[in-house]
Each structure stands twice: as structure tokens, then as C-alpha cells.
């Protein structure tokens, strides 16, 4: 099942992504070998929906009862359990049972349940960040992470300095939300001519934030150029690709101009307005944004070309 594969990928990547600028609490020093052995033995088992329920009612049951067996007061448990297991549990809950439309109902509720102590609360913030926000997680999802961030910036468990990184992340996450008009910006071509994103005329626009010589950027470019569906849309001028370089090394940018097809728009942000005004999230490059004819966001900050194809085929 593709979702389960994504979850496994997310966990292998997210475990290493404990952000150094986020608040942590120290735990008691322990014997490392004993701790590792204990961590392997500990586990969390979510609630199980009654077998006789119809599928939709099972989903609703799991949304309501998934964490019933978890003791939110037991900080010893989260100090000792292998975090990979808890990241898996969180990923299954957030991506398997919570659609974007219900994120504002269930994600703040979970964070409130985790508010029994600062240690428990920051642990669940770490889980949410690893699954929903880490740039390497294929499960990252701002629509589900925003309610978590909004809870964090209001939490009495964090002081004003501890809330600052969450306030920053919230400001960025609120940009270019799905279904809303994408932030406009001016780009400059190699000829020196300038134009704006919103003046691109096409049924669809694919923003490709890229860096010169970036291996992952090359992979994404190859996926786009070898997609029969995308190439057909580009040839019919229904889809336009805007490759945008947000940084300052124009010599490197010019050296790599030939890396991209001539049919694509290849520009740079001369004033670094995208970064300075935080118009787009630049924490991970490459990044793709798919926009419709009115420049409403259909896909945000992703690298999944297959997902772009899926949206365009619907």
C-alpha cells in the first residue's frame, strides 16, 4: 500500500530531524545499554475499531479513540521509547485518519491532550514537526501542521523565546495555502527582461524553485521532461514551467541555464524578495508549486511529479 510505504520513508527520514532551535527538556541520565534495551521493548498500541463497523465509521472511531491507550502523564515512557515507533504511530494517525478538512478539529485536540507537562507537549511537537514539517518527509503537510503551530504559539507551557521559532514557522506555513492565490513575485530573465508570476498566461503554471547544479533538482527536472502527460500539456501551451532561482550567485545560475528546456521560463529573483519577504518556503530546494489559471495553489512545496500528474488528470 503506497501510503504505508510513504509512512516508512517519512519515519526513516524524520527520526534524525529534531530541530535544534526548538525547546527541549533534559531527562535523567541513564545507562545507555539499559536504555536501548528498554526502548526496544516499549511500544504503543493504538485503539482498534470494532470489526463490525462500516469503513467510514471505523475511520471516525479511530479519529476519536486512537490515543485512548496512551498515558499522556507518563513522561518516563516517552523518555525511554524508541522515537521511531512514536513517529510511526503519529504518522499513521495524522495521515491515515485525519483529512485536511478535519485537521482543525483533531490536531489541536491532540496537542491539548499532550499538555499534561512541558516534556510531553514538546515531545508531541517533535513528532508533529518530524512527520508534517521536516523538509525530507514525503508526508509534510502544512494544512495539518498549521493547527499544531497555532496551538504552540498560544501554549502557556512555552515561554516567549521558545514560541519564537513556531511563530516563524507559522508565518511561513500560512503562505500559499491550497486553494488560495499564490504570492506574486517578479522574476528576471537572462536577457534582463522582467515579468511577474501573475502575468503568466496558461491554464496551469508549475513553479520550480531550483538551485544550479543541485542533484535533486536535476532528478525532478528529468521526471518532468520524461513525463508524456506534462510534455503534451507544455507543447499545447496549457502548462508553463517557471524555474526560479532565489539566491545571489548569478554566475553559477548562468552557467546552468542550458540545463533546462528552452520552452521553460528560467528566471531569478534579482532583489531576493522571495526570501526577504518570506513569500515562499525556501527551507528545502527543489520545491514545486502547481497553480491553476487564476494562480490558485493546487500543490504546495512538493517534489512528487506523479502527484502533479494526478492533479492535472483529475
Name these PLM-found stretches.
Residues 257-289, 293:
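Short, internal strand/loop/helix patches
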Residues 188, 265-270, 301-302:
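Short acidic-hydrophobic, aromatic-tinged amphipathic segments that line or gate anion-handling sites
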Residues 195-226, 240-242:
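Short active-site neighborhood of thiol/selenol oxidoreductases, capturing the structured segment around
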Residues 279, 283-314:
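Non-catalytic, surface beta->alpha helical segment in thiol-disulfide oxidoreductase systems
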Residues 221-258, 272-276:
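Structural microenvironment flanking redox-active thiols in thiol-disulfide oxidoreductases
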Residues 13-16:
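C-terminal motif of bacterial Sec signal peptides marking the signal peptidase cleavage site
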Residues 19-193:
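Oxidative protein folding and maturation machinery
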Residues 2-8:
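Sec-dependent signal peptide recognition
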Amino acid at each position: 500500500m503506497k501510503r504505508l510505504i510513504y509512512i516508512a520513508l517519512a519515519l526513516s527520514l524524520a527520526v534524525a530531524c529534531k530541530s535544534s532551535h526548538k525547546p527541549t527538556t533534559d531527562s535523567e541520565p541513564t545507562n545507555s545499554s539499559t536504555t536501548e534495551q528498554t526502548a526496544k521493548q516499549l511500544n504503543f498500541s493504538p485503539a482498534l475499531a470494532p470489526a463490525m463497523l462500516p469503513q467510514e465509521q471505523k475511520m471516525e472511531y479511530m479519529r476519536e479513540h486512537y490515543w485512548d491507550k496512551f498515558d499522556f502523564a507518563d513522561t518516563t515512557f516517552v523518555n525511554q521509547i524508541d522515537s521511531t515507533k512514536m513517529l510511526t504511530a503519529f504518522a499513521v494517525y495524522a495521515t491515515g485518519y485525519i483529512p485536511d478538512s478535519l485537521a482543525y478539529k483533531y490536531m489541536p485536540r491532540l496537542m491539548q491532550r499532550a499538555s499534561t507537562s512541558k516534556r510531553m507537549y514538546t515531545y508531541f511537537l517533535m513528532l508533529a514537526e518530524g512527520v508534517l514539517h521536516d523538509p525530507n518527509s514525503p508526508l509534510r503537510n502544512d494544512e495539518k501542521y498549521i493547527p499544531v503551530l497555532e496551538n504552540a504559539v498560544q501554549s502557556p507551557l512555552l515561554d516567549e523565546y521558545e514560541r519564537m521559532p513556531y511563530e516563524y514557522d507559522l508565518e511561513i506555513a500560512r503562505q500559499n495555502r491550497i486553494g488560495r492565490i499564490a504570492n506574486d513575485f517578479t522574476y528576471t530573465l537572462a536577457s534582463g527582461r522582467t515579468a511577474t508570476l501573475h502575468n503568466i498566461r496558461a491554464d496551469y503554471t508549475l513553479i520550480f524553485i531550483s538551485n544550479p547544479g543541485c542533484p535533486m533538482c536535476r532528478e525532478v527536472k528529468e521526471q518532468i521532461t520524461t513525463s508524456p502527460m506534462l510534455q503534451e500539456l507544455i507543447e499545447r501551451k496549457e502548462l508553463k514551467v517557471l524555474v526560479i532561482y532565489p539566491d545571489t550567485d548569478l554566475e553559477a545560475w548562468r552557467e546552468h541555464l542550458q540545463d533546462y528546456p528552452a520552452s521553460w521560463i528560467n528566471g531569478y529573483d534579482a532583489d531576493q524578495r522571495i526570501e526577504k519577504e518570506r513569500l515562499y518556503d525556501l527551507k528545502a530546494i527543489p520545491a514545486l508549486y502547481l497553480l491553476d489559471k487564476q494562480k490558485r495553489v493546487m500543490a504546495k512545496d512538493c517534489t512528487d511529479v506523479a502527484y502533479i500528474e494526478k492533479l492535472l488528470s483529475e
